[in-house]
Amino acid sequence: MDKSKINLAVIVPLFFIMLYLLPLGLRDLWSPDELRYAEIAREMVDSGNWIVPTFNDIRYFEKPVMGHWMNAISQVLFGENNFSVRAASAFSTLGAAFCLFLLVGRFANRKQAWVTVSVFLSLFLVSNLGTYSVLDGMLNLWLTAAFTAFFYAADSPTTSQRCRFYGLAGLFCACALLTKGFLALALPVIVVVPFMIWQRQLVDILRWGWWVMLVALIVTLPWALAIHAAEPDYWHYFFWVEHIQRFAAEDAQHTSPAWYYLPYLLLGTLPWLFLAPSAIKHLKGHWQSPLLRYALLWALIPFIFFSAAKGKLVTYILPCMAPLAIILAQGIISAFENRAKGLKIGSVINCAFFSLISVAVIVLFYMGRLPLEAEEFYRPWLLVVVCGSWAVLAYISIKAKSLEGKIASYMLMPLSLFLLAWAIIPNISIDSKMPGRFLEQVSPLVSDDAILIADYPSTMSAFNWYFKRRDVYLTGNTGEVSYGIGYDDAKHKYVAPSLLGEFIRKQSVPVVILFREMDVPQSLPEPDKRIERGKFTLVYYDRVKR
């Protein structure tokens, strides 16, 4: 690739459209996350209640409201479909990339800004969560904006500029808090304070800290008071259960060892992982840059913080990716300017690795070792196309003479995977985590007056979303709606497994039960129909036979 033919200012927007927007509607929604957030937003729009989040008309206090607002607005704009469910995550990622462009473009240069954005948008963890409906992408937008505003404020020479940028930082911290809670306030504090100490500007943050907190309070207070008036115990549950127990208590959710994030960090930095050793090596001499120091603390301290917490999920380290992109971009530029052999070596390893994966997929396919059905014969070949195109781009990057050529080659490597993912996902995954196809198959059995029963909130959300119902009964484990279903006006939605047979016999309308997490109880009456597909089992009772 020749420098005269490569313009990242053109390629990056096209890349965003092709990877982040075009495939959004192609894949069915994943359970439980995407169906849960799709349904909460749908109920918000349908009910007109934008204060109290509900899930199957059950109070849902696990998260604040900003992420649900963003998802709901997306459904208002684009309708109730797969694209709208994921659109807020995609545009949040674009917003975070724009913040990085402003930050690096202002305190480094325009070329480095485009390289940083190229790295960020193509990081495997970023692109995965940017095309998947979870709240972490939206949280990352507000945190990236807050960290950008803090750095602008620290560098501002006048009082009016500092007032403006510290105020913006408070605004973005409030939006982050309204998206995922008090964690949004902790991360800026544990990063910005050490940075200001390093820069010998601690007095500055002490002088302006009150202003940041005041703005955050002003922005947060209207909804905080509204939710307290509507549901007085919201803040008690949200603070103690969702924060203290999730992250620190002995019975914290998702407990994992301290090293849990390390392999995911390596995977999440693909395809740039192959250039990372050379990039890090050539950062020597650049650490006097305040921006690079800031990025180091921004990446390292939250990573240590999340690693030390008892509760862990891969999505938690997403806020570390933006500063990592700043560091990698600076290192790659420096390595290229010094004609480092490490860049070529990394690309050779990259090319060889994905070439070997292509061969391995073909061999495993012909040996019958892939978990595929006969009708899925084409899926391995699509995966070979993905790995082959990745290897070809790695080879092109070796031959590229310009920095822009190398960057564009690496940025485009994940593109074919995301464009073809909808066709590569095997039936074994579809029939376990994507219930849309199964429910479409059984939809003729689900009349408007049928009683729907699910064995877990994940199957409940599938009934909710695909049949536009908010009156689904639960049996078995209540999971994440355990607290909400304990309210007097929601208790009737739970039927204990031991009482399920009696409940069915009392009905005068069809009963449809979806099982995934539990076996069908032997005590149930003989169903009129029983349909199984993968991990999903549906039992149907017609009103005629009682």
Swiss-Prot record:
Pathway: Lipopolysaccharide metabolism; 4-amino-4-deoxy-beta-L-arabinose-lipid A biosynthesis
Described function: Catalyzes the transfer of the L-Ara4N moiety of the glycolipid undecaprenyl phosphate-alpha-L-Ara4N to lipid A. The modified arabinose is attached to lipid A and is required for resistance to polymyxin and cationic antimicrobial peptides.
Name of the protein this chain belongs to: Undecaprenyl phosphate-alpha-4-amino-4-deoxy-L-arabinose arabinosyl transferase
GO BP terms, alphabetized: lipid A biosynthetic process; lipopolysaccharide biosynthetic process; protein O-linked glycosylation; response to iron(III) ion
Recorded family membership: Belongs to the glycosyltransferase 83 family.
Reaction catalyzed: 4-amino-4-deoxy-alpha-L-arabinopyranosyl di-trans,octa-cis-undecaprenyl phosphate + lipid IVA = lipid IIA + di-trans,octa-cis-undecaprenyl phosphate
Membrane topology qualifier: Multi-pass membrane protein
Membrane-traversing stretches: 6-26, 87-107, 113-133, 177-197, 208-228, 260-280, 289-309, 313-333, 345-365, 380-400, 410-430, 450-467
Location(s) in or outside the cell: Cell inner membrane
One Pfam family hit: PMT
NCBIfam families membership: PRK13279.1
UniProt GO cellular component terms: plasma membrane
Enzyme Commission identifier(s): 2.4.2.43
Record InterPro entries: ArnT_tfrase, Glyco_trans_39/83, LipidA_mod_glycosyltrf_83
One annotated GO molecular function: 4-amino-4-deoxy-L-arabinose transferase activity
Principal subcellular localisation of the protein: membrane
Highest taxon listed in the record's lineage: Bacteria
Keywords of this entry: Cell inner membrane, Cell membrane, Glycosyltransferase, Lipid A biosynthesis, Lipid biosynthesis, Lipid metabolism, Lipopolysaccharide biosynthesis, Membrane, Transferase, Transmembrane, Transmembrane helix
The protein's enzyme class: transferase
